[in-house]
Amino acid sequence: LILGTSTTGIGDLQDDWDGFLPSFAKSNLADKKVAIFALGDSASYSSSFAESMRVIYDAIEGKTTIVGSVEDEGYIYDDSMGVIDGTWLGLPIDEDNEYDQTDARIEAWVEDLKKEFV
């Protein structure tokens, strides 16, 4: 499963997830693998860039295998709850400021996911 969200406000999860995420997190995910990606604006919201992936991560952590983490090297941001020990919890995408890197980041992430989902 691949779950994606935009980040709204200051690191907030998109409202569309409000009704879905609690019931999804209660599902039997034990034998599933889940990858997360988040869209955000690393320039305007540098201290909360792509934080919304953390909300999803926290809701499903320990209930499934979460795959698709990405090293934070090359990303320009100040802080984010979407990062633990220098590693993003999924793929952060900034089409506003780092659009020139999006294709390469997605391609590398998909190649990693292919190995995980086999």
Question: At which residue positions do the language-model features occur?
Answer:
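FMN-binding flavodoxin-like domain, especially the glycine-rich phosphate-binding loop
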Residues: 1-118
